[in-house]
Amino acid sequence: PLIIRTFKQAMASMSRKHSNSSLRTERDLPMPLLLGTIVVIAILIWIIPTFPVSPIGALIVVIFGFFFASVSSRMVGLIGSSNNPVSGMAIATLIIATLVLKATGTVGTTGMVGAVAIGGIICIVAAIAGDTSQDLKSGFIVGATPIKQQIGELLGVVVSALSVGFVLYLLNEAWGYGTEDLPAAQATMMKMLVEGIMNAELPWGLILTGVFIAIAVEILKVPVMPFAVGMYLPFSLSAGIMAGGAVRFIVERIKGTDKEKKERTDRGVLFTSGLIAGEGIVGILLAVLTVFEVNIALDFSLPQILSLVIFIGLLLILFRQCMKKDK
């Protein structure tokens, strides 16, 4: 219901928007240019051999890309990037794309790779739409020109696309996807989903059980997406999320004005955002060292204890950063 409601609101706001506005802060890229670009990209997805996508698959990309980009940008613009349901959109697209491809005779490895390609493209579309919406919202606050921001966003996508392929290849060479060192939980789940639908081996009993659990969780007024993510992600990943949530729970209940509590939360978000970015950079550096067989491991008898101490130390630093008052 939320996604459908958001889509209707986004379409209503689009119909009221005039791209040829005389105001500098309301000038966007021309709509004919955007529509033409979408058509060209859809054709390229169809004809480039790297994407084993049929014309029907390219049409699915256009339809779902338009739908989910509108939803994603609207939700991020209203609430924030933390509420962008990228995983849910990608999985929904993956299921529908697999069923459509199977029904039209595109089966086997070709059909599965095509479905994953379609789901991956939609996942990227939703993620970029949310990020762009966040940037445009920030630009509006400071009085930026939307068309210039949009050109910058396009350049950023091109540059990142040129580098992300190398990073993915590097990670696969270093550890391999689906291994203990690089579980890739979401990718593994998508693989199992596509194989299950194509081979008619999907465990519908488990899926229906999950559906009823989700309904019960919604009735209890618990956000179902974080609940589901916590169930299928490895504990090594969800433990950090839980610990960060515990720190925020404590910080928000320490006495202070509403303004002070908001400032504490904002400082915590900034600090943890830096940790996430730093973890990604360190992961790439470790992958490079692994590929070139450079051993920098410390000879420590109980590495788990050292990791736990560092983890607790980071939580204490996070708490201190949240409670630190501006001078």
Q: Where is each model-derived feature located?
A:
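Hydrophobic alpha-helical bundle architecture
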Residues: 74-86, 102-110, 120-124, 132-155, ...
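Juxtamembrane interface elements at the cytosolic ends of transmembrane helices
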Residues: 1-19, 67-75, 128-141, 246-259, ...
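Membrane-embedded translocation segments of transport machinery
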Residues: 41-133, 141, 170, 181
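Membrane-interfacial loop-to-helix junctions in multi-pass transporters
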Residues: 27-33, 52-55, 59-68, 104-115, ...
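Membrane-interface interhelical connector segments
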Residues: 172-199
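Cytosolic juxtamembrane amphipathic/interface segments immediately preceding
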Residues: 14-32, 75, 138-143, 190-196
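Hydrophobic core segments of alpha-helical transmembrane domains in multi-pass membrane transport
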Residues: 1, 33-49, 61-69, 94-101, ...
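Signature of multi-pass transmembrane helix bundles
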Residues: 1-63, 152-153, 298-305, 320-323, ...
